């Protein structure tokens, strides 16, 4: 599989997605202020609402001609539907994130069917002692922005 990302605003050709089938709102990890706000105010969405929203989103992507690469489900991998955090691409290099929370680290195992299609010399695993999530990375051609949060070192 050929990969290449030089910016965040060019036409999206393919994207990794993961089903929200395993989402359990009763077992929601309160790990940031946004989630805490919604949990404290009764605004945590139902599983059905999330699945419906995801279906609509996937339908829009397909109508736009985006190829969906669907990750396999991994038991115990909370937040697996947040695929942006698990890995990222800069140029032609595929980086496997190093997640701080162990249950989040499990989720990348669902990507094996996708990772196995990438040239192994293009894959870089972020070391375990550096916490870096793909959602903290923004690529803008020769400039790469890295956000820093409580879960990033």
Describe the role of every protein-language-model region.
Residues 1-153:
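The feature marks the mature, well-folded catalytic cores of soluble enzymes
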């Amino acid at each position: 599989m050929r990969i290449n990302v030089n910016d965040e605003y060019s036409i999206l050709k393919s994207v990794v997605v993961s089903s929200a089938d395993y989402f359990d709102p009763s077992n929601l990890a309160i790990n940031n202020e946004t989630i805490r706000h919604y949990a404290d105010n009764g605004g945590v969405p139902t599983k059905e609402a999330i699945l419906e929203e995801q279906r609509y989103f996937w339908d829009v992507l397909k109508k736009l001609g985006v190829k969906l690469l669907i990750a396999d489900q991994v038991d115990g991998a909370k937040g697996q539907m947040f695929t942006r955090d698990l890995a990222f691409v800069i140029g032609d290099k595929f980086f496997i994130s190093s997640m701080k929370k162990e249950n989040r680290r499990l989720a990348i195992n669902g990507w094996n069917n996708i990772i196995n299609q990438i040239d192994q010399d293009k894959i870089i695993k972020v070391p375990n002692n550096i916490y870096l999530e793909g959602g903290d990375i923004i690529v803008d051609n020769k400039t790469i922005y890295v956000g820093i949060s409580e879960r990033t070192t």
